[in-house]
């Protein structure tokens, strides 16, 4: 089962609507996961330019979102990454937030496992 399906099952279980998949958000998430891997950092704020997820979206012409969230995880499998996010109150709150309507997911595999980036709008 893919991570998007796992997220939507969690949302349905708390009576939140499932999220619509966004390829644009996924491309942005994947690019950021790759950047963190290649440049060796782990942070919501890009150390090379100070950008947060909102700036990353606006830079590629994504319409300014009313609500935005981002989750980062490192894990050996998609399942363990999802479980790790659900085990963290702030990450779980982002996943379950009923204000969000769309999700994009980027996953990069490296020598130390997976880097997972989720973007919510």
Name every feature range the model reports, one short phrase each.
Residues 1:
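Phosphate/diphosphate ligand-binding glycine-rich loop within oxidoreductases
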Residues 4-121:
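Functional surface patches built around histidine and acidic residues
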């Amino acid at each position: 089962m893919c991570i998007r399906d796992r997220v939507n099952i969690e949302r349905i279980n708390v009576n939140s609507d499932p999220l619509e998949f966004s390829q644009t958000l996924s491309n942005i998430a994947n690019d950021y996961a790759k950047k963190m891997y290649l440049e060796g950092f782990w942070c919501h704020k890009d150390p090379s330019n100070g950008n947060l997820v909102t700036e990353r979206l606006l830079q590629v012409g994504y319409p300014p979102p009313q609500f935005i969230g981002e989750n980062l995880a490192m894990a050996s499998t998609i399942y363990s990454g999802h479980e790790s996010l659900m085990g963290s109150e702030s990450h779980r709150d982002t996943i379950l937030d009923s204000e969000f309507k769309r999700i994009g997911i980027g996953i990069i595999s490296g020598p130390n496992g997976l880097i997972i980036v989720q973007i919510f709008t």
